């Protein structure tokens, strides 16, 4: 009995150490310039900035559903959420871009996205007197492509979702998660989910060779964040699964060979629901 108590104590201690070392809570909104972010929000939803004037950033990253990346699909890939993306240090599908502003530039000019050019964006902005006045008020050099990217960057910085129940738990509030949710977190670690989904965004900052069993490819892809996962369906890079429970089951059966049972899957599901943070204030403005 004494040995069992000691063993349980060691396991509890190791769990606490892992929790503290590989997960980082978001306890407050990342600082951003409100004027620039408000301007960036306008640019984000403006279809006139795309080559054929039919799509905007918001076409794929719908603000009405919290920029979760679940809007109309115009590419073969499942658009990722923009919530908390500013906290990442690698970007793009394969993680080759190391800077948020550079990712925005790519999204604006890529023929698979807005498919526009720097000069076209500047000309479209200059056609709108309200835009021109706002740029001159915020930036000394007025309307430039770099300033447009800067405004969009500030808007995306504003899309943090702090203080999820998991964040509160990490910060020391042991009552923030129920007993089942804590067991789900333990199972999440036990089965190696945290080996990819870790850090401040529980993913988003490492790349992995995806297994054939899941997505039929050996591509090196960026691991997605699990924050707000209950809001960001569909799942996987091509959006093949529409329900979170089904995504968990697919991983259980194909990666872990069914090692954990349905009860543990349900506990992990309950834990993942605790990753939903506060809606960014700028989405109400």
Task: For every predicted segment, state its role.
Residues 4-13:
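Sec-dependent N-terminal signal peptides
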Residues 16-285:
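Periplasmic c-type cytochrome electron-transfer domains
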């Amino acid at each position: 009995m004494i040995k069992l108590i000691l063993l349980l104590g060691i396991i509890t201690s190791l769990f606490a150490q892992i929790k503290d070392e590989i997960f980082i809570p978001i306890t407050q909104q990342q600082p951003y310039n409100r004027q620039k972010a408000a301007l960036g929000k306008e640019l984000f939803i403006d279809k006139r900035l795309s080559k054929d004037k039919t799509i905007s950033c918001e076409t794929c990253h719908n603000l009405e559903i919290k920029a979760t990346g679940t809007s109309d699909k115009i590419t073969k890939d499942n658009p990722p959420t923009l919530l908390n993306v500013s906290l990442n240090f690698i970007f793009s599908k394969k993680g080759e871009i190391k800077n948020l502003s550079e990712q925005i530039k790519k999204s604006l000019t890529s023929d698979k996205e807005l498919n526009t050019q720097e000069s076209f964006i500047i000309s479209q902005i200059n056609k709108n007197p309200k835009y021109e006045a706002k740029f001159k008020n915020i930036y000394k050099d007025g309307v430039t492509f770099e300033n447009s990217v800067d405004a969009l960057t500030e808007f995306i910085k504003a899309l943090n979702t702090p203080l999820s129940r998991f964040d509160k738990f990490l910060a020391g509030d042991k009552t923030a998660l129920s007993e089942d949710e804590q067991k789900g977190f333990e199972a999440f670690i036990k089965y190696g989910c945290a080996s990819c989904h870790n850090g401040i965004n529980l993913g988003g900052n490492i790349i992995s060779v995806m297994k054939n069993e899941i997505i039929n490819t050996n591509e090196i892809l960026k691991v997605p964040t699990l924050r707000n996962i209950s809001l960001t369906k569909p799942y996987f890079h091509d959006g093949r699964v529409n329900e979170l429970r089904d995504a968990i089951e697919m991983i259980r059966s194909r990666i872990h060979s069914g090692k954990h049972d349905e009860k543990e899957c349900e506990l992990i599901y309950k834990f993942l629901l605790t990753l939903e943070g506060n809606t960014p204030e700028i989405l109400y403005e």
